[in-house]
Amino acid sequence: MFREGQTAQVLDTPFFDFIALAKALQPKVVIAENVKGLLMGNAIDYVRRIYKDFEDAGYYCQHFLLDASKMGVPQMRNRVFFVCIRHDLGVNFLKVSDLFNVEPHISMDFNEPGICYGEFADYMGKPYGKRMKEMFDNRTHGDIDMSNAYRKLTGKRGFFNQCYLYEDEICNTLTAHSDSAIPFKKPVYLSTAEVCNISTFPQDYDFCGFSPHYICGMSVPPVMMAQVATRVYEQWLSKL
């Protein structure tokens, strides 16, 4: 079980059904992604199975842990990408990757300059209710979240998930909850425009009645996906 946007996820049949579909269709390249937790603890057994199933499907498989904040996304968000190329095509790019493996070479190193919240902050979001406003009024510069103010007011522990956004810092991972990332400067939630910027969604995106926080918090940023796809095209597909 893994977590993305504070929602538990289980890697089960849909992921492996996707690999089975790739086996049937045999596209030149297959790209899949999942949460960082996939590489931790016992979950690594799933990674081994993913590699085996892609191998059986006729693909070389590699995985990369990528940070969106280094890819032109104003958000620190880690995702695991599985980048696979069909055996008959991958032989054109084989390179020794370590002492034991030969893999089709592709660089997934990114070092784009970070984009801080202050570059697009508009403070046009919904104002806080009474309880959130009270904790906001008891904040201290340097607070990471609302937990210090909550402890000051109640003597209890809590509100660790309401993380402050400073103008000179990059946003932490945006989750599906509207209070997961909140401006330190003003007592308002993030506006729709700010949420779209943080997740690199179009400003005119139609959320079809769903919360922008929910959709963006549960999605891989489009610019992050575009960066991976561009590398695949430039280093593999354009050379075939």
Where are these regions (language model features)?
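Conserved active-site and SAM-binding loop architecture
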Residues: 1-240
